[in-house]
Amino acid sequence: MLDAFSKVITSADGKAAYVGGADLQALKKFVSEGNKRMDSVNAIVSNASCIVSDSVSGMVCENPSLIAPNGGVYTNRKMAACLRDAEIILRYVSYSLLSGDSSVLEDRCLNGLKETYASLGVPAAGNARTISIMKATVIGFITNNSQQKKLSTPAGDCSALASEVGGYFDKVSSALA
């Protein structure tokens, strides 16, 4: 995993150049937005169990056959696995948001996820819907538009962070498609 600083340094080192210009400005912006980034991650972490359970519940409410016999999350064991997997995905999205880099999400969470779910017979549509609900909920927390928040989110415009986290969820959706 390379954070924003490591990426810039690695790039400059590869060119045998000093860090400067646009790279330095990008790092200055990353640092100045740091408190918003940390507060946004804190909002996700503080509300993680609600985000995960509401996302999975929303998926089940929209498709009740999933909890019927032979459904994708029929047994307690399958439901627990579904909740666990959603929590893991949310955790890696929060790591990516904190570092400003999606490589940890891609390398440690998404690599082989689709194949694993396919081999277990997990329905792809349910996964996609859970991720979609989770994305909307997290963006609501970051932009301070959620009714359920336990903590306040940062003041000011967080639309760039909301867009960034939306991109991480889009990577998850693409990996599962």
Curated annotation (Swiss-Prot):
<comment type="similarity">
    <text>Belongs to the phycobiliprotein family.</text>
</comment>
<feature type="binding site" description="covalent">
    <location>
        <position position="61"/>
    </location>
    <ligand>
        <name>15,16-dihydrobiliverdin</name>
    </ligand>
</feature>
<keyword id="KW-0249">Electron transport</keyword>
<keyword id="KW-0934">Plastid</keyword>
<comment type="subunit">
    <text>Heterotetramer of 2 different alpha chains and 2 identical beta chains which form 2 alpha-beta heterodimers within the heterotetramer. The two alpha-beta heterodimers are rotated to an open configuration in contrast to the closed configuration found in other cryptophyte species due to the insertion of a single amino acid, 'Asp-65', in a conserved region of the alpha chain. In the open form, the central chromophores are not in physical contact but are separated by a water-filled channel.</text>
</comment>
<dbReference type="GO" id="GO:0015979">
    <property type="term" value="P:photosynthesis"/>
</dbReference>
<comment type="function">
    <text>Light-harvesting photosynthetic bile pigment-protein from the phycobiliprotein complex.</text>
</comment>
<feature type="binding site">
    <location>
        <position position="54"/>
    </location>
    <ligand>
        <name>15,16-dihydrobiliverdin</name>
    </ligand>
</feature>
<feature type="binding site" description="covalent">
    <location>
        <position position="82"/>
    </location>
    <ligand>
        <name>(2R,3E)-phycoerythrobilin 3</name>
    </ligand>
</feature>
<dbReference type="InterPro" id="IPR009050">
    <property type="entry name" value="Globin-like_sf"/>
</dbReference>
<keyword id="KW-0793">Thylakoid</keyword>
<feature type="binding site">
    <location>
        <position position="28"/>
    </location>
    <ligand>
        <name>(2R,3E)-phycoerythrobilin 2</name>
    </ligand>
</feature>
<keyword id="KW-0150">Chloroplast</keyword>
<feature type="binding site">
    <location>
        <position position="18"/>
    </location>
    <ligand>
        <name>(2R,3E)-phycoerythrobilin 1</name>
    </ligand>
</feature>
<feature type="binding site">
    <location>
        <position position="149"/>
    </location>
    <ligand>
        <name>15,16-dihydrobiliverdin</name>
    </ligand>
</feature>
<feature type="binding site">
    <location>
        <position position="85"/>
    </location>
    <ligand>
        <name>(2R,3E)-phycoerythrobilin 3</name>
    </ligand>
</feature>
<feature type="binding site">
    <location>
        <position position="35"/>
    </location>
    <ligand>
        <name>(2R,3E)-phycoerythrobilin 2</name>
    </ligand>
</feature>
<feature type="binding site">
    <location>
        <position position="156"/>
    </location>
    <ligand>
        <name>(2R,3E)-phycoerythrobilin 2</name>
    </ligand>
</feature>
<dbReference type="Pfam" id="PF00502">
    <property type="entry name" value="Phycobilisome"/>
</dbReference>
<feature type="binding site">
    <location>
        <position position="39"/>
    </location>
    <ligand>
        <name>(2R,3E)-phycoerythrobilin 2</name>
    </ligand>
</feature>
<feature type="binding site" description="covalent">
    <location>
        <position position="50"/>
    </location>
    <ligand>
        <name>15,16-dihydrobiliverdin</name>
    </ligand>
</feature>
<keyword id="KW-0089">Bile pigment</keyword>
<feature type="binding site">
    <location>
        <position position="154"/>
    </location>
    <ligand>
        <name>(2R,3E)-phycoerythrobilin 2</name>
    </ligand>
</feature>
<feature type="binding site">
    <location>
        <position position="144"/>
    </location>
    <ligand>
        <name>(2R,3E)-phycoerythrobilin 2</name>
    </ligand>
</feature>
<dbReference type="GO" id="GO:0030089">
    <property type="term" value="C:phycobilisome"/>
</dbReference>
<feature type="binding site" description="covalent">
    <location>
        <position position="158"/>
    </location>
    <ligand>
        <name>(2R,3E)-phycoerythrobilin 2</name>
    </ligand>
</feature>
<feature type="binding site">
    <location>
        <position position="129"/>
    </location>
    <ligand>
        <name>15,16-dihydrobiliverdin</name>
    </ligand>
</feature>
<feature type="binding site">
    <location>
        <position position="84"/>
    </location>
    <ligand>
        <name>(2R,3E)-phycoerythrobilin 3</name>
    </ligand>
</feature>
<dbReference type="InterPro" id="IPR012128">
    <property type="entry name" value="Phycobilisome_asu/bsu"/>
</dbReference>
<keyword id="KW-0472">Membrane</keyword>
<keyword id="KW-0813">Transport</keyword>
<keyword id="KW-0602">Photosynthesis</keyword>
<feature type="binding site">
    <location>
        <position position="148"/>
    </location>
    <ligand>
        <name>15,16-dihydrobiliverdin</name>
    </ligand>
</feature>
<protein>
    <recommendedName>
        <fullName>Phycoerythrin beta subunit</fullName>
    </recommendedName>
</protein>
<dbReference type="GO" id="GO:0009535">
    <property type="term" value="C:chloroplast thylakoid membrane"/>
</dbReference>
<dbReference type="InterPro" id="IPR038719">
    <property type="entry name" value="Phycobilisome_asu/bsu_sf"/>
</dbReference>
<keyword id="KW-0157">Chromophore</keyword>
